[in-house]
């Protein structure tokens, strides 16, 4: 009897929760249950009447002597017909529960599939209604035009010292970024630009391609090809830089074990004020010259913002790089492990990718770098600077000390139109200002204007000796470079940016080979360049 009550109650609950789940055939079941319930109630009334009659009759009889009572017989088994019907009702209830579950899954999937498309600042994005799935187009286009004002002295130097004026597509990137099932993210970005190396278009190479797990926030796990953070200057995205290129000291560190397309496994901590990252890196995806084991390195960074309010932000960044195993140059067990450091003079229009300062060692045990940087913004002003230290330990050399180099930079900007630079928590770095009013002559809007400046120095000399003198034992004549840059950035809207910059480059270096041995092969010149950028 209780079982029938429970079955009836469960059936009623399911019918109330999901009325659409019951078909016309279920109405007959409900009618039969109602009839059975009425029969049970009638039987209960009759049993009650019999009990009352027996009680009255027992009151007039003498009390019987106590006798041993036999064990009660087991309850009679329900008739086969009733048992069959109960089993059928059980099956119907199970079917209704399963049907209700399927309908709930279908409802949830229908909600998920109701995707929403949007365009924000030129970026097309499609996302599911619950936000667990998304896909967004990403793109960066940078077209550079530059002129090197060198004169006859540069053309008289050894091959490679004369920079070629002209133009190139510094970056031409197109990618897809999004997430799946809420906690997983991905980013695939292909670059068809020259990267500043040849000045010509490329068939395309991986700039970033990684998978990321975000379900343990604020911790993030990332694996694939991407540039790990090697410092504050490095963490500015390519489209958010103050000037056309990063500082030379920062770029040296970036290229040691970071940079675009770097194979890496990285653990990040991303908080409002605190940022941390630790990455194990290998070669770049596009590097194909090494025949055997590739480079292995550790890259780490920690950044903290002790002051954050509506007017101020102060950030301090400490980072380090350890290339503990440089890559082999051939497939033999005794293969040398070469390592080099070089950087163009903070503008990449030259087709030959000429470097005025560089260091190259044929066989290296390890190479390392660390840097301390800091930046502060006050409303529409930014001031930033950093110091960098580098070292190389030669392999198989016990009589000479390791080689040491350094560099530093200071830079700043003033947004003339009053906007402030933004902040990227994901990168712990500043972003471009967004114009209050987009450029529109008909509406009197002119976008945002930013004045920027930088001074950087990079010293790749170590016990270099003097001009006219022989190179001391263990000395390195990598050269010293000093660059002063001023620029004007115009932001017509959040997608477009135009940068006009002028530079004074001063490089001093003592030659080591041939006719230039022990002679000064440095040079001083000016550059002027323009970048047109679209980024979304």
Question: Could you tell me what each predicted segment is?
Answer:
Residues 119-326, 376, 404-409, 414-444, ...:
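Outer membrane beta-barrel
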Residues 212, 314, 320, 330-536:
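Outer-membrane beta-barrel pore domains
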Residues 110, 162-164, 362:
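Short, surface-exposed alpha-helical recognition segments that flank or form part
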Residues 22-140, 416, 420-438, 444, ...:
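N-terminal periplasmic/intermembrane-space "pro-region" immediately following the signal or transit peptide
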Residues 1-22:
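Gram-negative bacterial Sec-dependent N-terminal signal peptides
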Residues 17, 21, 148-149, 394:
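N-terminal low-complexity, intrinsically disordered patches enriched in charged
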């Amino acid at each position: 009897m209780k079982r029938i009550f429970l079955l009836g109650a469960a059936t009623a609950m399911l019918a109330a929760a999901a009325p659409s789940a019951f078909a016309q055939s279920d109405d007959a079941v409900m009618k039969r249950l109602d009839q059975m319930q009425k029969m049970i109630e009638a039987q209960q009334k009759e049993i009650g009447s019999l009990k009352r009659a027996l009680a009255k009759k027992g009151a007039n009889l003498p009390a019987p002597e106590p006798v041993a009572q036999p064990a009660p017989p087991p309850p009679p088994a329900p008739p086969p017909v009733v048992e069959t019907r109960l089993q059928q009702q059980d099956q119907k209830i199970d079917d209704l529960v399963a049907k209700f579950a399927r309908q709930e899954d279908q409802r949830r999937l229908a909600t998920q599939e109701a995707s929403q498309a949007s365009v924000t600042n030129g970026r097309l994005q499609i996302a599911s209604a619950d936000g667990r799935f998304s896909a967004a187009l990403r793109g960066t286009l940078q077209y550079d035009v530059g002129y090197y004002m060198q004169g006859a002295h540069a053309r008289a130097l050894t091959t490679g010292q004369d920079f070629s004026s002209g133009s190139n597509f510094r970056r031409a990137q197109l990618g897809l970024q999004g997430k799946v099932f809420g906690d997983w993210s991905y980013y695939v970005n292909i670059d068809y630009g020259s990267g500043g190396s040849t000045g010509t278009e490329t068939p395309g190479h991986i700039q970033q391609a990684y998978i990321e797990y975000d379900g343990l926030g604020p911790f993030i796990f990332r694996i694939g090809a991407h540039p790990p953070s090697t410092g504050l200057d490095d963490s500015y995205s390519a489209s958010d830089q103050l000037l056309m290129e990063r500082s030379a000291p920062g770029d040296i560190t970036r290229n040691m074990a970071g940079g675009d397309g770097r194979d890496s496994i990285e653990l990040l901590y991303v908080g409002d004020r605190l940022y941390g990252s630790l990455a194990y890196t290998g070669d770049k995806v596009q590097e194909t010259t090494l025949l055997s084991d590739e480079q292995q390195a550790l890259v780490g960074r920690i950044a903290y913002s002790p002051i954050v309010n509506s007017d101020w932000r102060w950030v301090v960044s400490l980072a380090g790089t350890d290339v503990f195993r440089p890559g082999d140059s051939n497939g033999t067990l005794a293969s040398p492990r070469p390592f080099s450091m070089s950087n163009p003079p903070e503008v990449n229009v030259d087709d030959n990718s000429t470097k005025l300062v560089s260091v190259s060692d044929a066989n290296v045990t390890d190479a390392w770098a660390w840097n301390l940087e800091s930046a502060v913004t006050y409303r529409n002003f930014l001031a930033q600077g950093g110091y960098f230290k580098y070292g190389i330990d030669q392999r198989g050399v016990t009589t000479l000390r390791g080689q040491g180099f350094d560099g530093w930079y200071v830079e700043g900007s003033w947004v003339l139109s009053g906007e402030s630079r933004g902040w990227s928590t994901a990168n712990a770095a500043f972003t471009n200002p967004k114009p209050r009013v987009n450029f529109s002559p008909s509406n009197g809007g002119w976008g945002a204007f930013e004045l920027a400046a930088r001074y950087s120095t990079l010293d790749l000399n170590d016990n270099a000796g003097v001009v006219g003198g022989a190179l001391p034992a263990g000395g390195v004549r990598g050269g010293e470079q000093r660059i002063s840059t001023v620029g004007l950035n115009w932001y017509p809207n959040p997608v477009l940016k135009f940068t006009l910059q002028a530079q004074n480059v001063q490089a001093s270096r003592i030659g080591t080979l041939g006719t230039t041995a022990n002679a000064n092969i440095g040079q001083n010149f000016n550059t002027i360049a323009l970048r047109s950028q679209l980024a979304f």
